[in-house]
A protein has these predicted regions:
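Active-site proximal beta-strand in glycosyltransferases
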Residues: 27-56, 67, 71-75, 96-99
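Donor nucleotide-sugar binding/catalytic pocket of nucleotide-sugar-dependent glycosyltransferases
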Residues: 71-85, 90-108
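Conserved donor-binding/catalytic core segment of Leloir-type glycosyltransferases
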Residues: 113-130, 135-139, 149
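Nucleotide-activated donor-binding/catalytic signature segment of Leloir-type glycosyltransferases, i.e.
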Residues: 162-191
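Short alpha-helical segment that forms part of, or immediately flanks, the ligand-binding pocket
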Residues: 194, 217-222
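Short alpha-helical donor nucleotide-sugar binding micro-motif in glycosyltransferases
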Residues: 195-200
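Short hydrophobic beta-strand element within catalytic cores of glycosyltransferases
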Residues: 226-229
Length: 233
């Protein structure tokens, strides 16, 4: 299974909607500088979606001699752009912001009546971004009309990544399985999630991770869900 996180989803959209001949005229590297060799015969673009302080990114940007290697730096949010230009003095003349995009997601049609309907909550983020906080909150909730479905593990970044990292979060998965008001489902594809967002009333994401542009939140908002999250990032 290939990784299909936010970066991969955005690249798939780009390849779907932009003419291949045009894309072939540039070389686009996503997030990690020089993970593919720089092209000598076409413009080099670094499409930056990761936060400025990531250990596989920070040292490269801190060395200003690297800044001339790319012709353009494209950021997925103004927040991300501002951090890179502030902390690394990246030349703004080479920087541009193109925000993340999503498919057209039909909004849920059935109205939610809190006194009559069960409140169905979805959480579909990686486990290190606040799942521990959310499960702690669910332990305190005693109302039987509130139920959480958790689509969270490391498989979104591929099976090799999951095998190496899922054991670190097994206690969280076990906690989710023990709670009566939580259904631990694990990984489902982005297409599956988008099809089923209409079945939920609320998306809850108590992020402890600095998001650069949260796609899961954007999709949930587009589907008409009530959304609760932090302003971290």
């Amino acid at each position: 299974m290939k990784p299909m996180g936010g970066t991969e989803l955005q690249m798939a959209y780009l390849q779907k909607f932009v003419d291949k001949e045009l894309l072939d005229k540039v070389q686009i590297t996503t997030s990690v500088p020089e993970k593919i060799p720089l092209a000598k015969d076409k413009p080099n673009i670094l499409w930056q979606k990761n936060a400025w302080d990531q250990p596989n990114i920070h040292p490269w940007f801190k060395d200003k001699s690297n800044h001339s290697k790319y012709d353009w730096y494209v950021f997925n949010s103004h927040w991300n752009y501002e951090h890179y230009t502030k902390f690394f003095d990246l030349p703004t003349i080479k920087c541009v912001v193109i925000k993340n995009g999503i498919d057209n997601i039909p909004a849920r049609e059935k109205p939610f009546h809190p006194k009559r309907d069960k409140c169905r909550i979805i959480h579909h983020c990686t486990p290190w971004r606040g799942l521990n906080v959310l499960l702690g909150a669910m332990e305190l909730i005693k109302d039987p009309m509130i139920e959480l479905d958790v689509y969270s593990n490391c498989e979104v970044y591929g099976k090799d990544f999951a095998e190496a990292n899922d054991p670190s979060y097994q206690k969280l998965y076990d906690q989710a399985k023990r709670l009566k008001n939580v259904n631990y489902i694990g990984y489902k594809s982005n297409e599956y999630i988008k099809r089923h967002l209409k079945d939920y009333n609320m998306f809850v994401y108590p992020s402890i991770w600095e998001e650069t542009f949260c796609i899961s939140l954007l999709e949930s908002m587009a589907a008409g869900l009530f959304c609760i999250t932090t302003n971290y990032g």
